Amino acid sequence: MRLKNLIVFALATSFISTSLVSASADSAKPGQSMTHMKTGAGLASTLEAAGVVLYVQGGATSSVIGDSIGAAAGQYVFHIPITSNKSGVQHLGSNIVFFNTANNLQLQLRNPVIELSTGVVRALVPQAGDQVLDILTITNASTLKAKITRDRKANLRTTAYVGATLSLAPGIAASISSILGLPANSLPDAAAFGSADVTLYGKDKRK
């Protein structure tokens, strides 16, 4: 498979959302708001074949489903702590990194913010002059509904958004290719990117 196809598939099926831990980390601790991202089966091996590895920094962690990242069915799973949801779902202190081992170039997505109301995921990108860029579009934002559950004993309210589908934001594909030193037009504009689940915990104010 040509490098172009490898990179397109790799970035088209990611999330995002980080150090390797057991896949059992998929469940957040009680009371800890979290964004979970999972790549499509085969992404890890495709990235490896293309010389691009995906990892996280800061408070985020990751796990691998399957035998290894080189296995055909291997999947990355990212667990990114939510630090606030007053102005978008914020992940202060967590970075998602694409690293091209062929040339040591990297793309960092720092402190990503999920704007559920507008259907956009933004992040600060140091390699783009520290600009805050629209990185992803939530393609099903208009139909994404919150599921709310309450534990009155624990005075806990849980708000879950399950199955947010993501694609590259318009125009960002060319920037990713350029920053990683990939051939021009390696990524199609608005390519499918993956999915994410968001779980928010808070006090149950309803009596």
What are these regions (language model features)?
Residues M1-V8:
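Bacterial N-terminal signal peptides that target proteins for export
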Residues L124-A174:
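Extended amphipathic ligand-handling, pore-lining, and cofactor/metal-binding catalytic surfaces
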